Every structure is written in C-alpha cells, then in structure tokens.
Amino acid sequence: MSRRTAQINAPLSRRLKGDPIPWLLEKEDPGARYLAMRDVLGLPAEDRELHLARRQAHAHGPIATVLDKMDRSGYWVQPGPGYGPKYRSTVWSLILLAQLGARVEEDRRIAKATGYYLDNALLEGGQISSSSGPGGTVDCLQGNMLWALTELGCDQERLQPAVEWTARSVTGEGISPASEKDAPRRYYASKCGPTFACGANNKKPCAWGGVKVMHALAILPGRNPALVRRAIAQGAEFLLEGNPRPGGVPQRVGQPAER
C-alpha cells in the first residue's frame, strides 16, 4: 500500500496544501476508505486489502444505513416503480448505493432490491419508467438507473433491453415519432425524440439528461455493439459542439442557466 500511496502523492502534493491519502484511508470511515482504495489508488478488484475494505464498507456506514431502511420485499418507502417520493424512495436509494460503491456480491439485499426494481420499472421495450407504462420514461431516469444498476453489478443479460432502448433513443434507429400511436416502438411525450430530446425541455435536446445517458453507456462492460458505439458518438458530438463551461444548451424558458 505504501508504495502505491507514494505514487499518488507526488501529483497531488503539487495541487493540494497537504496529502489527503492517509486521511482518506483511515479505518474509522470504511466507506471513504473503500472508495479511496478503489478510485484514488486504483487497486485491482482482486486485491485482498480492497476486498476486505469493501466488505467493511457494506457492514458499517452509509451502505448499511440505506440497506437497513429497505423493505424486505426490495423497495424503499412505497412499492412500485419507486420514483417518488424524492429523494428517499427506491430509485434514489439505488442511485445512492451505486455512488457509495455497493455491489450485489456483498449483500443479498442489493440483489433483492435490483430485482424488485427491474420487475416494477423495466418495461418489455427496454424503457425504464417512473410509472406503469412507457410514457413514464425520460433520459435522466433511464440514464441514472442504467448506470446505477450496472454499477451495482446487476445481471447484464437482464439489462440488455434497457441498453438497446437507451442507445436507440439517442440515434433514433428503429423508433417511430410519438404521433404514430400504433408503432411497435415509438417516442412519447416525455422522451420525444433522438439526441436527448425531452418534453420537459420544450422538446429540445436536454444536456442534463444526455450526460446521464452517456454516463451509463460509458461504463457498460465488454465491447460495445455497433449500436451503442453510434449512440456514444452522437451523444458526444452534441455535448461537445459548444463550450461546456458557459453552457448554451437548450433549456426551458424561465429556468436558470446553471443548475
């Protein structure tokens, strides 16, 4: 550990007033210790010390707190697709668990929760919905949950319909306009068109939803199929076509430029 820490310390010391690594690795905060070992030190998944830290992070701290509030059926606060109430229900609990580094291998309750969520929110067409129908899908939810479920270690075969819909919804391949009500695969009032078009954004491309979709597509394991690669290329072109610092992306009238 000390040699690896030394390798990290040199570039950090030029930017910071002190070395944060020893503080991040303190055993009193197992969650922060685990994430620092994984993301800052870059220890491989098979590293014994990292494995022990991950186990401790699941037994104590925020991961354990979130899991202790889960209903035995696999949901938080109320049954169903779990979008509300913000920010305590199933959607937000799963996102938080993913951000904290939780994994299905470490606690059977995580597998229970991801299975329950997919049973209630993933539709046959691959849409991840806030309601019981495909009209409840939107890029920010789709991207957030595909990312979270992938990070948590959810079975990729189970997620494949969501991956395909996510990629197609960006490129528009094989998806009919919302007006074609009888089409087997179409856009809807909220998810209304390709390149992150969103009904809540006056049907214009939404960079906030787009970032979440790109985040999800970027971490898919293995070699991406051509459809996913095309979606990533199209999404990157949209997000990088202007200066990201001032923004300038389409947004609803009356909404703040920075959010």
Language-model features: locations:
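Preference for long, amphipathic alpha-helical scaffolds in soluble/luminal domains
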Residues: M1-R259
